[in-house]
Amino acid sequence: MTIKLIVGLANPGAEYAATRHNAGAWFVDLLAERLRAPLREEAKFFGYTSRVTLGGEDVRLLVPTTFMNLSGKAVAAMASFFRINPDEILVAHDELDLPPGVAKLKLGGGHGGHNGLKDIISKLGNNPNFHRLRIGIGHPGDKNKVVGFVLGKPPVSEQKLIDEAIDEAARCTEMWFTDGLTKATNRLHAFKAQ
């Protein structure tokens, strides 16, 4: 099993670029930078895309330009065009249930109230069996404050932790293609930015 599509979830536009909800896009942006493969807007895929080679495999990068709750439109368009199965997709997203400085990989599961994941599951024919990179952003402590929290910018101290976790996640993603998922997961799950 190889990953053929790596997606970073986000809301479009400058006003959202630095918000916690865009952590997935920060990850894909970093990966594109590390692999010297600048993202370019591609209208038919409703997002910014790039093609990279990882471990000898052709992999597409995607940051949708739809709003978060319509992310599935971009993912489904690209998956359908390149005949990519759900289990060949890695979706990077912000995760309330993990603290800043931590990132974890998992396959399948629910959407945990995340509107981007919810739409992707729906547009992939109600198939939740894609890989996720969960990037910890922490939780405001009160579920009524979640919307304001994810659409807010993290303080500098938290941003530093999130950036370090994303950096490690990028290294581990590259490792996945050379050394396998188990090794990459073990390394990433042992990491916690200080």
UniProtKB/Swiss-Prot annotation:
One BP annotation, GO: rescue of stalled ribosome
Subcellular location: Cytoplasm
Listed GO CC annotations: cytoplasm
Enzyme class: hydrolase
Active site: H21
Reaction equations catalysed: an N-acyl-L-alpha-aminoacyl-tRNA + H2O = an N-acyl-L-amino acid + a tRNA + H(+)
Predominant place of localization: cytoplasm
EC number: 3.1.1.29
Keywords, comma-separated and alphabetical: Cytoplasm, Hydrolase, RNA-binding, tRNA-binding
Transmembrane segments: none
Described purpose of this protein according to its UniProt entry: Hydrolyzes ribosome-free peptidyl-tRNAs (with 1 or more amino acids incorporated), which drop off the ribosome during protein synthesis, or as a result of ribosome stalling.
The family this protein is said to belong to: Belongs to the PTH family.
Full protein name: Peptidyl-tRNA hydrolase
Organism this protein belongs to: Shigella boydii serotype 18 (strain CDC 3083-94 / BS512)
Lineage of the species this protein comes from: Bacteria, Pseudomonadati, Pseudomonadota, Gammaproteobacteria, Enterobacterales
